[in-house]
Amino acid sequence: MSERNGMNYIEILLVEDNQGDVVLTKRALKSGKVLHNLHVANDGEAALAFLHDVEYGQAPRPDLILLDLNLPKVNGREVLAKIKSNEALASIPVVVLTTSKADEDILKTYQMHANSFITKPVDWPQFMNVVRLIEEYWFTVVKLPLHEG
């Protein structure tokens, strides 16, 4: 969480290569109730670079990561593995938000300690609703641990 103009902002990292989904996610979050800063990484390599900067105080620590699985350069499973194996990052909630409906993907990501697995709806209003529900759940229902920095 960061502060700007005396207000607390939630830091969200969206790891998504589909620009249409990036735009829809931005719109859904903008229409939500939570003040936020959205950081976008368009591939797994960019996500890992952002998280490297977080470790060294050069980028804000995300309060939530929305992670696609099918990413160029470094796939989402590899990104998830790096996050959850890093003591400094492991407590950040990771929501896998992907087009996959495969039971194998669901099982594997939970075994890798993803906090949620959500299949992206193809319908625009449903997609918007899913993003708003993610926001509501993670920032109004759930109590997250405090972190330093």
Predicted regions mapped to residue ranges:
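Active-site residues of response regulator receiver
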Residues: 68, 98
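Hydrophobic residue at a beta-alpha junction
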Residues: 71-74, 83, 92
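Short, glycine/charged-rich "phosphate-handling" switch motifs in NTP-dependent
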Residues: 115
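Acidic, metal-coordinating helix/loop segments flanking the phosphotransfer/catalytic sites
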Residues: 4-5, 26, 40-64
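Two-component/phosphorelay signaling modules centered on CheY-like receiver
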Residues: 19-44
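C-terminal output helix
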Residues: 46, 122-134, 142-147
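Conserved acidic carboxylate
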Residues: 16
